[in-house]
Swiss-Prot record:
Top-rank lineage group of the source organism: Eukaryota
GO-annotated cellular components: extracellular matrix; extracellular space
Localization of this protein: Secreted
GO biological process terms held by the UniProt record: collagen fibril organization
Pfam families referenced in this protein's UniProt entry, alphabetically: DERM
Disulphide-bonded residues: 32-58, 67-172, 84-110, 111-117, 123-167
Keyword Signal found: yes
Sequence repeats: 21-25, 50-54, 73-77, 102-106, 129-133, 158-162
Family from the record: Belongs to the dermatopontin family.
Signal peptide per UniProt: 1-19
Function: Possesses the property of inducing both aggregation of amebocytes and agglutination of erythrocytes.
Protein name: Hemagglutinin/amebocyte aggregation factor
Entry keyword annotation includes Protein transport: no
């Protein structure tokens, strides 16, 4: 009998379901540990709540960073288009949801190592990584860091689609 395998699968499922950073309609506040930046992004959408739950994974990419949160980078129902400054990587997100507007406003946590610059020749934007109301899964390619996000909102679907920018960092 394969009962240990069944227990592991059930445990894995329970662990994953509890891994969301935010609740439906709740605040989101996530920062990678010092010296890490965002490596993976996952999200699911609920038509009932007209909101997304989010999860992030991090990877060691920085040595001695200085970090800051931006001001809000989008208005309700408007385009979000943001890139960190040269040499910076995205290491966190902060947002809150408004039930009347069924949207989120976002702040982004950028971190920079001294003497690091963005190698703009290596930068690339993804296409949209999720469909309206669909799951979102994105992994930053090996040896790259997450540097930018684009998101558009649709008032009929009350959801956002997302694109991400990744770049390599180089010594300045």
């Amino acid at each position: 009998m394969n009962s240990p395998a069944i227990v592991i699968i059930i445990f894995s499922t329970l662990t994953f379901s509890e891994a969301w950073v935010n609740d439906w309609d709740g605040a989101l506040n996530f920062q990678c540990q010092l010296k890490d930046s965002i490596k993976t992004i996952s999200s699911i959408h609920s038509n009932h709540h007209e909101d997304r739950r989010w999860n992030f994974g991090c990877e060691r990419t920085l040595r001695d960073p200085s970090c800051y949160f931006t001001n809000y980078v989008n208005d309700w129902d408007k385009l979000l288009h943001f890139t960190c400054k040269s040499g910076e990587a995205i290491a966190g997100f902060n947002s809150y949801h408004d039930n009347r507007r069924e949207d989120r406003r976002w702040k982004i946590y950028c971190c920079k190592d001294k003497n690091k610059c963005t190698d703009y020749r290596t930068c690339a934007w993804t296409g949209y990584v999720n469909s309206w109301d669909g799951d979102l899964h994105y992994t930053v390619p090996k040896d790259y860091v997450l540097t930018g996000v684009i998101s558009e909102h649709d008032n009929h679907r009350e959801d956002r689609r997302w694109k991400f920018q990744h770049c390599r960092l180089k010594n300045c």
